[in-house]
Swiss-Prot record:
Catalytic class of the enzyme: hydrolase
Catalytic reaction annotation: urea + 2 H2O + H(+) = hydrogencarbonate + 2 NH4(+)
EC number(s) reported in the record: 3.5.1.5
GO biological process, one term: urea catabolic process
Protein name (database record): Urease subunit beta
InterPro entries named among the record's database cross-references: Urease_beta-like (IPR002019), Urease_betasu_sf (IPR036461), Urease_subunit (IPR050069)
Subcellular localization(s) per the UniProt record: Cytoplasm
Name of the gene encoding the protein in the UniProt record: ureB
Principal subcellular localisation of the protein: cytoplasm
Taxon lineage: Bacteria, Pseudomonadati, Pseudomonadota, Betaproteobacteria, Burkholderiales
One MF term in the entry's GO annotations: urease activity
Organism for this UniProt entry: Polaromonas sp. (strain JS666 / ATCC BAA-500)
GO CC list: urease complex
Signal sequence, start to end: none
Length: 112
């Protein structure tokens, strides 16, 4: 048993069933660890994470709510992202969107 692991009587739980996903390779080019939470707009993560930010626009990590992925210095890992749902509005983070993700499809500012 893994700490925090849950056993249920029903079928397996599938996270974000039916939503579009994307698999990306991410490289931490920083000299410190970077941790990204489950609902953080992935395109707006720390600039020291190297990956295709345009492809990640409007997506977050496809992991359980309240969890995170940690990228150690120099580490490269593959992550799965999932589309935001609902109204698809993003505010805060690095301030690169500040509104609807789908507004003309070009609400994403430069992230370098």
């Amino acid at each position: 048993m893994t700490p925090g692991e849950l056993f249920t009587d029903g079928p397996d739980h599938v996270l974000n069933a039916g939503r579009r996903t994307l698999t990306l390779v991410v490289q931490n080019t920083a000299d410190r660890p970077i941790q990204v939470g489950s609902h953080y707009h992935f395109a707006e993560t720390n600039a020291a994470l190297g990956f295709d930010r345009q492809a990640a626009h409007g997506m977050r990590l496809n992991i359980a709510s309240g969890t995170a992925v940690r990228f150690e210095p120099g580490q490269q890992r593959t992550v799965e992202l999932v589309d935001y749902a609902g109204e698809r509005k993003v505010f805060g983070f690095r301030g690169l969107v500040q509104g609807g993700l789908d507004a003309s499809g070009q609400s994403h500012k430069e992230t370098t």
